[in-house]
From Swiss-Prot:
Coiled coil: none
Protein name: Protein NUCLEAR FUSION DEFECTIVE 2
GO biological process: karyogamy; polar nucleus fusion; RNA processing
GO MF, one example: ribonuclease III activity
Signal peptide residue numbers: 1-29
Effect of deleting the gene: Failure of fusion of the polar nuclei during megagametogenesis.
Top-rank taxon: Eukaryota
Record's keyword annotation contains Signal: yes
Domain RNase III as annotated: residue spans: 48-167
Length: 191
């Protein structure tokens, strides 16, 4: 009877040791496997990362940029409101820039400058196209993302998203002039 108890105890001990070694090696193997797995990144996420580099602004809340790059044809959570806000930011940027240079600028001249920058065909759609927004903006399958109005809406929405993300319009204005800056010289000559 004592040998039977000893044998059972020895068997339990050996089985316990076997399982503890096998679970340790399993954990070690699992850890090695987990270390090799890279986080999934969608093409859209990659495009958003590239866009942040292009505009020189890193979003704290990437969902704002996602929304800015989402057209109304794609989702109810879209860029319409951000675009309206972005339009006002762009108009403020132009007004601030040109009133600071010439406080006596006529309202007609200032209005013309604002119109030039806000014009869908000749300005914001070109800037949006230059940033490659036609390949980034999410639209329904029946919608052409390279359409000027869609590019312009996305371009404007970026600045609305930046202002919300930064908590200040100043940052959005700074990024706007950085992105649009090469074309700003042409506007100055319009004065």
């Amino acid at each position: 009877m004592a040998t039977l108890r000893f044998t059972l105890l020895l068997l339990v001990f050996v089985v316990g040791i076997f399982f503890s070694f096998s679970s340790v090696s399993h954990v070690r193997a699992t850890s090695e496997i987990n270390l090799r797995i890279e986080p999934f990144s969608s093409p859209f996420a990659t495009d958003l990362a590239k866009l942040q580099t292009q505009i020189g602004y890193k979003f704290n809340n990437i969902n704002l940029l996602r929304r800015a790059m989402t057209h109304a044809s794609f989702s109810q959570e879209n860029n319409k409101a951000l675009s309206i806000f972005g339009t006002h930011i762009i108009e403020t940027a132009v007004s601030l820039q040109f009133l600071a240079k010439d406080i006596d600028i006529s309202s007609k001249a200032l209005g013309r400058l604002i119109s030039e920058v806000s014009n869908v065909e000749s300005s914001c759609a070109l800037d949006g196209d230059r940033l490659g927004l036609g390949k980034i903006i999410r639209v329904s399958t029946k919608t052409d993302a390279s359409n000027s109005a869609i590019l312009c809406t996305g371009f404007r929405a970026i600045f609305g998203a930046i202002a919300i993300d930064a908590g200040t319009v100043d940052e959005a204005i700074k990024v706007f002039w950085k992105v649009h800056g090469a074309r700003a010289g042409r506007l100055v000559s319009m004065l």
